[in-house]
């Protein structure tokens, strides 16, 4: 297994797909990196030689990825919460941020359902 940016890249996959295992690198950025390193996109990781891996490491090093990117995202979310804007309030409350309805859905953000017991009706 090739190790790039602290991530084990699977050997049996094509280069474009394998690079997406790194947090912060999607398909288009992976294609861009391989073009910059002059490595064939359809070539499997197991067929890469040390020279190609070195070029890919250099190209990947130019981007903000993995832990650095995660930290950046966390800091920007914390900033939104600190300034008290709408998005920050929604983050704090654990609700969807982008205008989705919350009456029926949004279970991913809210978490599991919390059952609420029925009130007993008052007798006359």
Curated annotation (Swiss-Prot):
**GO cellular component labels:** cytosol; small ribosomal subunit
Please state which protein family the record places this protein in: Belongs to the universal ribosomal protein uS13 family.
What GO molecular function annotations does the UniProt record carry, in alphabetical order?
Answer: rRNA binding; structural constituent of ribosome; tRNA binding
Q: What does the entry give for GO biological process?
A: translation
Q: Which InterPro entries match?
A: Rbsml_uS13_C, Ribosomal_uS13, Ribosomal_uS13-like_H2TH, Ribosomal_uS13_bac-type, Ribosomal_uS13_CS
Biased region (Basic residues) positions are 100-124
Organism (species): Christiangramia forsetii (strain DSM 17595 / CGMCC 1.15422 / KT0803)
Keyword list, A-Z: Ribonucleoprotein, Ribosomal protein, RNA-binding, rRNA-binding, tRNA-binding
Region annotated Disordered sits at 94-124
Q: How does it assemble?
A: Part of the 30S ribosomal subunit. Forms a loose heterodimer with protein S19. Forms two bridges to the 50S subunit in the 70S ribosome.
Pfam entry (one): Ribosomal_S13
Q: Which domain of life is it from?
A: Bacteria
Query: Function, please?
Result: Located at the top of the head of the 30S subunit, it contacts several helices of the 16S rRNA. In the 70S ribosome it contacts the 23S rRNA (bridge B1a) and protein L5 of the 50S subunit (bridge B1b), connecting the 2 subunits; these bridges are implicated in subunit movement. Contacts the tRNAs in the A and P-sites.
Q: What is this protein called?
A: Small ribosomal subunit protein uS13
Is the keyword Nucleotidyltransferase assigned to this protein?
no
Q: Mind telling me which Gene3D superfamilies this protein's record contains?
A: 1.10.8.50, 30s ribosomal protein s13, domain 2
């Amino acid at each position: 297994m090739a190790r790039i940016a602290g991530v084990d890249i699977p050997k049996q996959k094509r280069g474009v797909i394998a690079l997406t295992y790194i947090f912060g690198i999607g398909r288009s950025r992976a294609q861009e990196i391989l073009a910059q390193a002059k490595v064939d996109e359809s070539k499997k990781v197991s067929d890469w030689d040390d020279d190609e891996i070195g070029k890919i490491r250099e190209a990947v090093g130019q981007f903000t990825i993995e832990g650095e990117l995660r930290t950046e995202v966390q800091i920007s979310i914390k900033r939104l919460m600190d300034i008290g804007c709408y998005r920050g309030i929604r983050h704090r409350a654990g609700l969807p941020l982008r205008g989705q309805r919350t009456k029926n859905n949004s279970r991913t953000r809210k978490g599991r359902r919390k059952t609420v017991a029925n009130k007993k009706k008052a007798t006359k």
